[in-house]
């Protein structure tokens, strides 16, 4: 028992060294189900659907480690001036028909030129540090061929970082370390955030590129420039392609590359198997050195306006898997203002 407690403490030190105040690996939260809400990583997705798309997410990471990351968010985005609500390639013309089947999508046409606006609210807590981000996004969509559309988007917002010294277990740490401030209570600092992205999409594929934290900044809890945490730009590259196994079953493999200078590229891969517009299952794998992990996912659409999905993540590293516990993530979606004859037009 003592050895297990000791090992858990060692694992905790390793984890928080990677994601703590002076770390750069998790300045942005990680999401297992990003492929279901690409908007969270790329503002160019803003307003891509035929309705207002609202998502709620809760992620509990490494459940056996006290103070491990807990992330929740709300996103909402929708189109402005989109005139093809009843004529999109996946519009449901026959009640009960499958809007995702291959024969329906054969007549796919790109979206008409339109705008999109959105809002993002993210809460991320790790140990004695919590971050709250509020962002507003805008995107413009236009067809570039008879089957393909391109969108460009921007996001601007503010992040509040709160350090609660009362929750710090000091141990060998120095309470007078200026990197974590001198106040005995809570310290809050704010900084602006900006991001930009491009999104190329059709009935079969999507390719996206985005940069979040596009303007590097330094978070300081004291005035001395020597101390503080540098916030680096995060580059994301995403791509996916859908194949039809049958008229009602499709498979969507996708991949995301994440680059945070000076760290190596992180690779996130997923595959999603969907039956009609009813339910889906999926799996993923993250290559991230000692934090690599495998993910199992499943989701269901309930009616035309509500959907829910769940993912379970397990570390590949045996010691991390044993002592850190699993990671759970729930995503709930609401399609607001969606007409009875309109279904999601995009492959995710």
Predicted regions mapped to residue ranges:
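Subset of outer-membrane beta-barrel
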Residues: 26-348
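Sec/Tat signal peptide C-region and signal peptidase I cleavage site
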Residues: 21-25
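Sec-dependent N-terminal signal peptides
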Residues: 5-19
